[in-house]
């Protein structure tokens, strides 16, 4: 196998594929990526951890001989990152060693035969489409609410639903819940409906892929896998098994009080006051009064902080405690000039949402903290 490829093209595709490769593996070949010729003018780069697979095709400047070889993922990426901006020559030698040459640089890497690389899941094409920007928005607005606790398996990913009304993504860690829905990409009939649990790692890698792709994404699912096609790049992920909680039961239905804030002003105030919150609980206090919100935090060792934010609130005075980090993560991605804060009292879950959202439906439910 021998080919020549531009350094930029090689580095870009390696940056995506090596992201799914675990640095420490009990199966040595999984620390490698598979590079193989794909037709007369392209190469294919694949990486997997057996749960998530990314496959990228890249145009080669020339292919002198066809073939395939597995090479260390991280090492090749580090090399490509530091090479000069010049054509890269890649050649498989005898005994499965690989030579990489670029300008005055030359590297030799140990390779592994393709036969030892896991067989990758087959891709089943699907007519379902969703714009890259919409999918990225769904991920960015929900991924932070996925649990970090390894033991809570069914909460370690996002519920991804496609039906006749569009696409929904829901995540929760038991303390908060993020719900994002758009009317784009709806299913034509029951046979194309999707209801799956997608792992956090898959969403993180998918977010990276959408950042470099502007077109429509094709997607679909079978019994065990979900597929996302982004032009010449393909992501295949094993689904999570188990039953996601009934999130509709968590959505508050009797929150009869509401306050609206400038997103930027609220975000900056929360960020500043949180500097004095307890390092473990991140607890801050919201005191709502007529046309004003007082945010405060105190730490017995370091002091206290207070800041007021203008509001349109006209109800009774109310105190509510929140985890500042939970609020900040929502405010970072809400993408609206104003946000509405809906609640019943200081002991019930609150719901935050953007005032204007271009037809999308974004809700963030947060449990209060004891003060």
What residue spans do the PLM features occupy?
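Structural preference for solvent-exposed beta-strand-turn elements
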Residues: 1-371
